[in-house]
Amino acid sequence: MVEINDIIKLYTVHPNLDLIDKNFAEDCEFEAFNIPSFKVKGIEAIHEIFKAIGFYAKDIKISKYNYTHSSHCIVLNTQQEITFNILPFVKFNYRMIINIHKNKENKITKFEEITDLESVIQNIPLANYGYFNIIKPALGYLMVKAGSYNRGFQNNGPNKIQATMERLSDNFVEKKEVNYSEPLIKLSKNFNGVTHQDKIDNMDEELFNSKKIDIKDGSNNAWKKPLNLHQ
């Protein structure tokens, strides 16, 4: 497993080359997007790259870092300090991003160094002021103006699905109580406006009245008055 501390320890004027043998694959690629940029392949060539640090640098170290990782990749964001042999009294600070690609055996198959050029410019006083206060704002202004001159761009408006859902939401009315018999009652109305429910109520009333006993002759009214079933 690749340890972050092993990578940090390589950035010194006296690197431990055993850490390279431990973490790097034999056919690993090393690519630097620096000034100058270069690319090598093979673990022996990578040995020489880290041995060369002591040739051009009096001192180098990673002062701050953070990283993200997955099963196949590590992205190491570092802040480094370096003192060159030709300028032993001047310390340069710069940012370097290191991309580490691993295989299934947790060996490094590709190692990339990407130096942030803006962090290098910050170490040069006059260039620092001119770049961050004149050149960079001017380029931002030109990009904004270029966008305003693009007449061919058309805004497609809101998303069609979103607009449809909003219309449905506006037209939706929640009905709290549902009377399931209401449609049936409406359909069963005849031309006189009488429903089957009304007929049933009338039949119940006649049946109730028919069960009353005539006090005079003791007979049941149900035999004297037939029920009207056709109203």
Swiss-Prot record:
Q: Name one GO biological process term.
A: hyperosmotic response
- Superkingdom of origin: Eukaryota
Induction of its expression: Induced by srfA, during development. Down-regulated in grlA null-cells at 16 hours of starvation.
Give the InterPro entries listed for this entry: NTF2-like_dom_sf (IPR032710)
Protein name per the record: SrfA-induced gene F protein
- In its UniProt entry, the species of origin is given as Dictyostelium discoideum
